[in-house]
From Swiss-Prot:
The lineage of its organism: Eukaryota, Viridiplantae, Streptophyta, Embryophyta, Tracheophyta. The keyword Magnesium applies. Signal peptide: none annotated. It comes from Pinus taeda. CoA binds at K260, K443, G444. This is 4-coumarate--CoA ligase. It is an enzyme of class 6 (ligase). Pfam families: AMP-binding (PF00501), AMP-binding_C (PF13193). Both substrate-binding domains (SBD1 and SBD2) are involved in the substrate recognition, and are sufficient to confer the substrate specificity. InterPro entries: AMP-bd_C (IPR025110), AMP-bd_C_sf (IPR045851), AMP-binding_CS (IPR020845), AMP-dep_synth/lig_dom (IPR000873), ANL_N_sf (IPR042099). It catalyses: (E)-4-coumarate + ATP + CoA = (E)-4-coumaroyl-CoA + AMP + diphosphate; (E)-4-coumarate + ATP + H(+) = (E)-4-coumaroyl-AMP + diphosphate; (E)-4-coumaroyl-AMP + CoA = (E)-4-coumaroyl-CoA + AMP + H(+).
């Protein structure tokens, strides 16, 4: 209060009414709550082999996996790492871990050994489920009594086969009492700054997030039991895990799983299985809009195309509409720490609303958002850009073993600060303007500058370094480095030094040699200055 006048707080809610959410249920109980209605309908389909499991089979195997995990000694609250590409077994183990009262941390199988070890150790993983091809990356972890299970037909020496889980006796699963605030998923995110951190998502949080999308008389994201949902985005990413797999399980829709994206294969599967919903990301949109082969396939079954993970330009939106004239197209918006969905396009609702091109939707139900002035911290009215914050039951519990970063992200009033600059127009639609946060988005994947900077300055010929995003037509953004040399070193040597230690999307694309890295008096890198230099090049 200043001068006796109370400041107005501008809060925004969904156009849809709040709903009752069964947030007392564990995640698996919630997702399978209506399984009797869909028991014999297709639930999981492997696009490569046509292997199909119905809902009753998936629910049963989830209980078998829970029993198998218990038999292997995994206790309630302990961690399983899924180091897998998209596959049916991913869903089995994720849901089975929920039944066991365990926690799943997901990791990109293309990570280098050091990246996997760092996450597995930070998360406290006791069991890793993976492919035989990736086992050699886990030698260090196996020497520390981490059990490795492979889903391949012939497990490597020292590993167990997935059948120890999927063929266990489901009646032998010990009963566990799961509290709504217990953690069920532990994806890793770089947050608004710094190194990757474990995001604690609870049963209550994920149940709330799924409900905000697909529950209610007028679901914001209308999935039904006749739908076939394309699952081409990686399940180790929370967007696909939540808005595809979990939402489909809850709604009784079939999930068609592709291990990796290939445009021709994708179009063949859309035609063969009459895919109705296609969640994608901007790089896939780019492939679709630039390829002439789309017209050779019948894609008329597609009724929804939803894009997330990174902003999409109006030109790409328009080009996509030309290729899929019968589909409703729109964007959502989220971040891992928000569970991940903050906003969803109301064009996807059962009773849809008109939406504007370029909008990433309106805030989900049962939540509030506000826009804060990035200088003063005051909440802003419509049509003024500032940092978007969200408060609701779906947001993370916090970062694991990192109270400092948690406090910097979720304030005392429960608001999650996203680090994204956006505005809300008069129709409550959200538009992304910029990012306050430092994270680089390469094809939707997160790249933390601090992680690459730590690698760079570890080189004896590099005195100082800073990493910032540079715009790129296909990837959206790529990491580029500004480097201060302490002795002679070439751009190529620096690129190779980093590439040996990181996954493909973290590779440095350009190196600019400078005399000094601009920093604030407190020593913080002035990334805006470096981005301005790039813009001027």
């Amino acid at each position: 209060m200043a001068n006796g006048i109370k400041k107005v707080e501008h809060l925004y809610r969904s156009k849809l009414p709040d709903i009752e959410i069964s947030d007392h249920l564990p995640l698996h109980s919630y997702c399978f709550e209506r399984v009797a209605e869909f028991a014999d309908r297709p639930c999981l389909i492997d696009g490569a082999t046509d292997r199909t499991y119905c809902f009753s089979e998936v629910e049963l195997i989830s209980r078998k996996v829970a029993a198998g995990l218990a038999k292997l000694g995994l206790q309630q609250g302990q961690v399983v790492m899924l180091l897998l590409p998209n596959c049916i077994e991913f869903a089995f183990v994720f849901m089975g871990a929920s039944v066991r009262g365990a926690i799943v941390t997901t990791a990109n199988p293309f990570y280098k050994p050091g990246e996997i070890a760092k996450q597995a150790k930070a998360a406290g993983a006791r069991i890793i489920v993976t492919l035989a091809a990736y086992v050699e990356k886990l030698a260090d972890l196996q020497s520390h009594d981490v059990l490795v299970i492979t889903i391949d037909d012939a497990p490597k020496e020292g590993c167990q086969h997935i059948s120890v889980l999927t063929e266990a006796d489901e009646t032998q699963c010990p009963a566990v009492k799961i509290h709504p605030d217990d953690v069920v998923a532990l994806p890793y995110s770089s947050g608004t700054t710094g190194l990757p951190k474990g995001v604690m998502l609870t049963h209550k949080g994920l149940v709330s997030s799924v409900a905000q999308q697909v529950d209610g008389e007028n679901p914001n994201l209308y999935f039904h039991s006749d739908d076939v949902i394309l699952c081409v985005l990686p399940l180790f990413h929370i967007y696909s895990l939540n808005s595809v797999l979990l939402c489909a399980l809850r709604a009784g829709a079939a999930t068609l799983i592709m291990q990796k994206f290939n445009l021709t294969t994708c179009l063949e599967l859309i035609q063969k299985y009459k895919v109705t919903v296609a969640p994608i990301v901007p790089p896939i949109v780019l492939d679709i809009t630039k390829s002439p082969i789309v017209s050779q396939y019948d894609v008329s079954s597609v009724r929804i195309i939803m894009s997330g993970a990174a902003p999409l330009g109006k030109e790409l939106e328009d080009a996509l509409r030309e290729r899929f004239p019968k589909a409703i197209f729109g964007q959502g918006y989220g971040m891992t720490e928000a569970g991940p969905v903050l906003a969803m396009n109301l064009a996807f609702a059962k009773n849809p609303f008109p939406v504007k091109s370029g909008s990433c939707g309106t805030v989900v139900r049962n939540a509030q958002i506000k826009i804060l002035d990035t200088e003063t911290g005051e909440s802003l009215p419509h049509n003024q850009a500032g940092e978007i914050c969200i408060r609701g039951p779906e947001i993370m519990k916090g970062y694991i073993n990192d109270p400092e970063s948690t406090a910097a992200t979720i304030d005392e009033e429960g608001w999650l600060h996203t680090g994204d600059v956006e505005y809300i127009d008069d129709d409550e639609e959200i538009f992304i303007v910029d990012r306050v946060k430092e994270i680089i988005k390469y094809k939707g994947f997160q790249v933390a500058p601090a992680e690459l900077e730590a690698l760079l300055v570890a080189h004896p010929s590099i005195a100082d370094a800073a990493v910032v995003p540079q715009k790129h037509e296909e990837a959206g953004e790529v990491p580029v480095a500004f480097v201060v040399k302490s002795s002679e070193i070439s751009e190529q040597e620096i690129k190779e030094f980093v590439a040996k230690q990181v996954i493909f999307y973290k590779k440095i694309h350009r190196v600019y040699f400078v005399d000094a890295i601009p920093k604030s008096p407190s020593g913080k890198i002035l990334r805006k200055d470096l981005r301005s230099r790039l813009a001027a090049k």
